[in-house]
Regions:
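Charged helix-capping and loop-helix junction motifs
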Residues: 115-118, 143-150, 198-204, 238-243
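Gly/Ala-rich phosphate-binding loop of Rossmann-like dinucleotide-binding domains
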Residues: 47, 150, 154, 264
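Conserved phosphate-binding/catalytic region of the ribokinase-like
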Residues: 201-309
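Short acidic, glycine-rich surface-loop motifs adjacent to enzyme active sites
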Residues: 127-138
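Conserved phosphate/ATP/ADP-binding segment of small-molecule kinases
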Residues: 147-233
Length: 309
């Protein structure tokens, strides 16, 4: 089973407008409200792939109840820890070809609530083979929190796919307990090392830095150029076809879902890379975030190439 972790989930509200008028009333007929957060995007794609999974994290208040109801409606199993604070909202106003976002920072999670989550997390690990940890941490939680989760998972033989950024990522990979897979982009690699990465050769050299030692999989996503992957001591260039992009938001989360799914199915390294790229591409072809059409999987899969460097 795959356990997905979302510590800072949200209700994503989308308001489509022909024109946003300031300092007056804007009436909206078509409102979309979905359970949001990077880990929930991962979860939806895993569900569409028919992978056995369970979702965890922290939720609170009326919006937390709404979020779990949405997951129930999608038949996605979950086991969240409850907190006193209210789950956040993230509002996107779509207007004149642009998108204006209003993002709440989210609730503060107390030390007691963190301890309760960790206890629940340890229970869930008993039936888990892989864990995906995605996104930011809410207020009140230190940057080393994911390191604690990785340690708990590693101690039970469970492998962790980590998709976060900034100081949280840096702290997590500098710990003595390593994630099994990370999925940074070139900018995040440069930020981690404090230097520019401007070519494939520089990127390969960067991935040989001591900070990455002990991480089995490093999947550096390159947008339309595919990915550069380090698996163990080997490097691979993964190239993808040109496709029509409808909505790129959530593609990274969909890639994580594909990688986790393929790993859980004991696929070969090449199959893992290709599956991750395909699920990421499939997401870009849908209007909704964290959605794929599995019927189109095979046709794209055949067009992805993997070259060992």
């Amino acid at each position: 089973m795959i356990l997905t972790v979302t510590m800072n989930p949200s209700i994503d509200v989308s308001y489509p407008l022909k024109q946003l008028k300031l300092d007056t009333v804007n009436r909206i007929a078509d409102v979309s409200k979905t359970a949001g957060g990077k880990g929930l995007n991962v979860s939806r794609v895993l569900s569409q792939l028919k992978a056995p999974l369970i979702v965890t994290g922290v939720v609170g208040g009326h919006l937390g109840d709404y979020l779990t109801t949405q997951l129930d409606n999608d038949r996605i199993p979950h086991n969240f820890s409850k907190i006193k604070g209210e789950t956040r909202s993230c509002i996107a106003i779509l207007h004149e070809g642009s998108q204006t976002e209003i993002l709440e920072s989210g609730p503060e999670v107390s030390e007691e609530e963190q301890a309760e989550f960790i206890e629940n997390f340890e229970q869930l690990l008993r039936d888990t083979d892989f864990v995906t940890i995605s996104g930011s941490l809410p207020k009140g939680i230190d940057n080393d929190f994911y390191s604690v989760l990785i340690e708990k998972a590693n101690q039970t033989g469970v492998k962790v796919l980590l998709d976060t950024s900034g100081e949280t990522l840096k702290t997590s990979i500098q710990s003595s307990f390593k994630p099994y897979l990370i999925k940074p982009n070139e900018t995040e690699i440069a930020d981690l090392l404090g230097k520019d990465v401007n070519s494939e050769k520089e990127l390969i050299n960067a991935l040989d830095d001591d900070i990455f030692h002990g991480i089995e999989w490093i999947v550096v996503t390159l947008g339309a150029d595919g990915a550069l992957v380090k698996k163990g001591k080997d490097y691979y260039r993964v190239q993808i076809p040109i496709i029509n992009v409808v909505n790129p938001v959530g593609s990274g989360d969909s890639t994580i879902a594909g990688l986790a799914y393929a790993l859980s199915e004991n696929k070969t390294s090449e199959e893992v890379m290709k599956t991750g790229m395909v699920t990421g591409m499939l997401n870009t072809q849908e209007e909704k975030t964290g959605f794929i059409n599995p019927d189109h999987f095979d046709s794209l899969y055949e067009k992805v190439t993997v070259e060992r460097l």
